[in-house]
Swiss-Prot record:
Lineage top rank: taxon: Bacteria
Organism: Rhodococcus erythropolis
UniProt name for this protein: NDMA-dependent alcohol dehydrogenase
Enzyme category, top tier: oxidoreductase
pH dependence: Optimum pH is 7.0.
GO cellular component: cytoplasm
Cofactor(s) for this UniProt protein: NADH
Keyword Iron: no
GO molecular function: oxidoreductase activity
Cell compartments where the protein resides: Cytoplasm
Keywords carried by this UniProt record: Cytoplasm, NAD, Oxidoreductase
Described purpose of this protein according to its UniProt entry: This is a novel enzyme, catalytically different from common alcohol dehydrogenases. It is effective in oxidizing ethanol, other primary alcohols and benzylalcohol only in the presence of p-nitroso-N,N-dimethylaniline (NDMA) as an electron acceptor. NADH acts as a cofactor here instead of as a coenzyme.
Family the UniProt entry places it in: Belongs to the zinc-containing alcohol dehydrogenase family.
Length: 22
């Protein structure tokens, strides 16, 4: 079972990548 932080990281990863590219 993944930790809550790991799940949130994977869930928001695409959004964070977009923010870093901006």
């Amino acid at each position: 079972m993944k930790t809550k932080a790991a799940v949130l990281f994977e869930t928001h990863k695409p959004f964070e990548i977009v923010e870093l590219e901006l």
